[in-house]
Amino acid sequence: MSQNQIIEGPAVRLFNHPNGPVPAPKWNLGLDLGERQDHSALVINDIEWQSLGRCYTTYAYKFAPILTVRSMERFPLSTGYQNIPLIIAERVRQINEHQSKRTPHVPAKIELVVDAGGPGTPVVEMLRAMAPENLTITPVMITSGTGESRLKGGYHGVPRRDLVTRLIQMIATGCLQCPASMPNALTWHNELLSLSRTNTHPGESGEHDDLTMAAALAAWAATREAPELSPAAATKKTKYGFIDKPIF
């Protein structure tokens, strides 16, 4: 790829890695905690970096991020909150085992983003008490506001509309991929259609949104790690000169 080529789609990241040409893999888990007759759901995605060679002027390694949904789970209504940390610990163990085979010399980073509203706060504390060493826990209070905020205790405030809108845009622009054959993919597709009809909130239709919110939380974590995955980056046309420095 030419250094002066106009880049469209997921943006190219010029990346200097201190331990070699392979960026660390990142796994993002989104956990939506259900109340009453709502299911809890867990969605897992991961970021892989597609190698685009090296910049011929700076010798920086060039990568494009690829975000793929790897797992979607809707837990039975009988699943107690006290069982959630055990489920998360098992998923982290599975991720570590899988990643050790895929990139044995590059350990994975894993982040769990939890919907901390309603019953979420005590679950967050249980998760923190049992978290494996390489798991970062990020509690999110989903708000009706208009902007993100940092709250006490490591919590973040994120508007619901922003989460859902970003997720839909990432799917539409190809920034987020999900195999159609994945279990619960069709259920998620139907949730998204329902949300599109009800202005990002299922309250009027009575439909569930647990898979969508879990996917939105995981996608939010991914865009924090790789801003190139955000829809704004996907539509931006930029000519790169120096490392991470646009010419104009």
Range-by-range predicted roles:
Residues M1-M141, R161, T165, Q169, ...:
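RNase H-like, metal-dependent nuclease domains and their acidic two-metal-ion catalytic environment used
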Residues E133-G157:
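RNase H-like polynucleotidyl transferase catalytic core
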